[in-house]
């Protein structure tokens, strides 16, 4: 009795799947997820420091508009 290797036959190979469209979709999803994560981090940072930045800007504007002209007049 001969085995399959002796006849140079084995289990037939399946066709390789077409992965181009799937890979492109995965990359698109990954890119969008990274954009969303970056945007959330930016929004969180702005929200966390918004009041401090507003206060610093307000004090700087008072210094430039009120205090400096009084010193130089």
Curated annotation (Swiss-Prot):
Any one cellular-component term (Gene Ontology): plasma membrane
Keyword hit for Translocase: yes
Disulfide bonds: none
Quaternary structure and interacting proteins, as annotated: The complex is composed of 8 subunits; MtrA, MtrB, MtrC, MtrD, MtrE, MtrF, MtrG and MtrH.
Protein name, per record: Tetrahydromethanopterin S-methyltransferase subunit F
GO molecular function: tetrahydromethanopterin S-methyltransferase activity
Cited function: Part of a complex that catalyzes the formation of methyl-coenzyme M and tetrahydromethanopterin from coenzyme M and methyl-tetrahydromethanopterin. This is an energy-conserving, sodium-ion translocating step.
Keywords per UniProt: Cell membrane, Membrane, Methanogenesis, Methyltransferase, One-carbon metabolism, Transferase, Translocase, Transmembrane, Transmembrane helix
Protein location: Cell membrane
Catalytic reaction list: 5-methyl-5,6,7,8-tetrahydromethanopterin + coenzyme M + 2 Na(+)(in) = 5,6,7,8-tetrahydromethanopterin + methyl-coenzyme M + 2 Na(+)(out)
């Amino acid at each position: 009795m001969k085995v399959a290797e002796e006849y140079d036959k084995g289990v037939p190979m399946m066709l390789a799947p077409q992965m181009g469209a799937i890979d492109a979709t995965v990359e698109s999803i990954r890119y969008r997820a990274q954009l969303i994560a970056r945007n959330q981090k930016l929004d969180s940072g702005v929200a966390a420091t918004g009041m401090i930045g507003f206060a610093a800007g307000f004090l700087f504007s008072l210094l430039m508009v009120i205090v400096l002209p009084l010193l130089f007049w």
